[in-house]
């Protein structure tokens, strides 16, 4: 089916897609939702872009986010990307892990928080105003993480609807262009 989708003229300009079990999903929004089921890929927040029927891709919507050829990112001349760490938060988390992560001085940090990306108070105190960009994300698997008043105080960015793993990739790419927090946040709303 993936080959059928790739050769369908209407697929041009759609960006990277995942094709499996008759569904077409945009790479930005798709997630693996089951460890072993063959029907594992889904786009729970925005739904499928289309379907494959009789060997033809039928699109019913398109991503409105920038991607592929429309991207400002060019990694062709880079030998490595900035080091961005993901730290998963949980209730009752002690100070050891966040202090250790901050001490390594990564280029960026993705904080995977509870629910709406909620960060435990002690972790917030340790990571706020770090010398590197810090992005709040959620471990829930779906939904938007939007800014809250405490983010401005802590200099946190938010991942929008990206998973922590995808937020990490976007932050690595963003850091190849700028360290400006406002511009980095703009990338999360554009891509």
PLM feature segments, named:
Residues 10-15, 20-21, 46, 81-83, ...:
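Short coil/turn connectors at secondary-structure junctions
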Residues 26-116:
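Accessory alpha-helical/coil subdomains and C-terminal extensions
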Residues 11, 44, 104, 121, ...:
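Conserved active-site and cofactor/substrate-binding residues in soluble primary-metabolism enzymes
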Residues 116-191:
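C-terminal non-catalytic interaction/assembly regions of soluble proteins
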Residues 1-22, 26-30, 158-163, 167, ...:
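Short, glycine-/small-residue-rich phosphate/pyrophosphate-handling segment
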Residues 17-21, 88, 112, 137-138:
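Short beta-strand segments
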């Amino acid at each position: 089916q993936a080959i059928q989708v790739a050769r369908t003229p209407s697929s041009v300009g759609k960006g990277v897609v995942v094709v499996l079990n008759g569904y077409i999903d945009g790479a930005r929004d798709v997630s693996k939702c089951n460890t072993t089921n063959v029907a594992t890929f889904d786009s729970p927040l925005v739904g499928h872009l289309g379907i494959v029927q009789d060997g033809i891709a039928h699109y019913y919507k398109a991503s409105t986010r920038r991607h592929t050829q429309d991207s400002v990112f060019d990694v062709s001349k880079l030998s490595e990307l900035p080091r961005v760490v993901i730290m998963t938060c949980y209730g009752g988390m002690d100070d050891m892990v966040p202090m250790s992560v901050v001490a390594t001085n990564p280029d960026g940090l993705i904080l995977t928080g509870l629910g709406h990306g909620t960060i435990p108070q002690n972790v917030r105190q340790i990571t706020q105003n770090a010398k590197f960009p810090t992005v709040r994300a959620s471990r829930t698997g779906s939904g938007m993480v939007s800014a809250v008043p405490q983010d401005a105080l802590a200099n946190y960015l938010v991942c929008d609807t990206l998973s922590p793993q995808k937020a990490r990739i976007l932050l690595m790419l963003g850091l190849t262009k700028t360290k400006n927090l406002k511009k980095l946040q703009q990338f999360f709303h554009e891509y």
